[in-house]
Regions:
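Glycine-/small-residue-enriched transmembrane alpha-helix faces in small-molecule transporters
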Residues: 1-37, 74, 82, 143-169
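Small-residue-rich packing faces within the transmembrane alpha-helices of Major Facilitator Superfamily
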Residues: 19, 44-45, 130, 185-189, ...
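Hydrophobic/aromatic residues within transmembrane alpha-helices
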Residues: 28, 35, 86, 98, ...
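Transmembrane alpha-helices of multi-pass small-molecule transport proteins
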Residues: 30-78, 103-106, 159-166, 181-198, ...
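Hydrophobic transmembrane alpha-helices of multi-pass small-molecule transport proteins
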Residues: 47, 51, 70, 118-138, ...
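Specific transmembrane alpha-helical segments of multi-pass solute transporters/efflux pumps
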Residues: 48, 54-93, 99, 135, ...
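C-terminal transmembrane-helix exit sites in multi-pass transporters
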Residues: 51, 102-127, 246-265
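Helix-helix packing/entry segments at the starts of transmembrane helices
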Residues: 95-101, 167-187, 218-254
């Protein structure tokens, strides 16, 4: 099997795990920020043992790389917290659909970073995506849970777009496991104070679910995705990532009996169509 096909499989598997991970926001009754803390604790421990077993050097090449990876860890913590918050206040479908707008953010951020002009077509696609988001929102009152879910989901999508661009920059310098470890270890440090502020009570079932979320749906999936970026364009990875809400919504329907409304289905089709076209066009 050639390296590109292997990378495609890695990206597809990672996206499947990402999509299903959203269900943990409903399966766990803990606050979203505590779910993320548990997630990154288990995932960073798993990745550390993996790196030690593989005898990988985790020392970074330049001091400035530590600074950027700290930033990436902070962004990751914000991304996952808003992601689970979106799902907890609304539904898996709404949270995932709002988050899935991230490739549109990428099309705006990449030209800005590369100091290029934003194309008119990208602005049109952003408007179409926004219309899809509007369809998903049943009410424009900030007190509405679905509206809150969309807003949290959009923040999650925006921060994930930033993270994707930064990951692409450093995946050529370090192994996927090293990048994932630093990001998630930094997230642990950032989030640990919230444990003492909220003082959550854990049940055995919570710990088992957090371990599963941290090791399989975070450590392994995150590593697979970053590794796949070595031989796959960011735009191609974004196209594959469009399947994430599809996986999540299907599993939420079967396991949680969360059936999306007609508005959510229509809005989702508009969003995913715009996202798919924008990533195809940018190749």
């Amino acid at each position: 099997m050639d390296t590109r096909k292997k990378s495609l499989i890695e990206i597809h598997l990672a996206v499947f795990l990402f999509g299903v991970s959203g269900l943990f926001g409903k399966l766990l009754t803990l606050p979203s920020i505590i779910i993320v803390l548990g997630r990154v604790i288990f995932s960073s421990i798993f990745l550390l043992f993996l790196l030690l077993y593989m005898k990988k050097d985790i020392k970074l090449k330049e001091k400035k790389h530590y600074f950027y990876l700290i930033i990436m860890g902070v962004v990751l913590a914000i991304h996952w917290t808003t992601f689970f918050q979106a799902i907890q206040v609304s539904t898996v479908a709404i949270g995932l659909l709002a988050f899935s707008t991230f490739p549109v953010f990428v099309t705006f951020l990449e030209p800005y970073i590369a100091k290029e002009h934003i194309k008119i077509s990208n602005i049109v696609l952003a408007i179409i995506t926004f219309l899809g988001v509007v369809l998903v929102i049943p009410s424009f009152e900030i007190g509405n849970s679905a509206t809150q879910g969309v807003l949290y989901g959009l923040v999650s999508g925006f921060t994930y777009a930033i993270l994707s661009i930064l990951n692409k920059k450093y995946v050529k310098e370090y192994s996927s496991a090293v990048i994932a470890f630093y990001e998630q270890f930094i997230a642990v440090i950032i989030l640990i104070p919230f444990y003492f502020l909220q003082k959550p009570v854990f049940q055995i079932n919570d710990i088992l679910l957090l371990a599963l979320l941290g090791v399989v749906f975070t450590g392994i999936s995150h590593m697979l995705f970053i590794k796949g970026l070595k031989n796959i364009k960011a735009q191609t990875a974004s196209i594959i990532s469009s399947l994430e809400p599809v996986y999540g919504i299907i599993f939420a329907a079967f396991l949680l009996s969360e059936i999306p409304s007609i508005r959510e289905v229509l809005g989702g089709l508009v969003i995913l169509s715009a996202v798919f076209y924008s990533t195809i066009k940018s190749r």
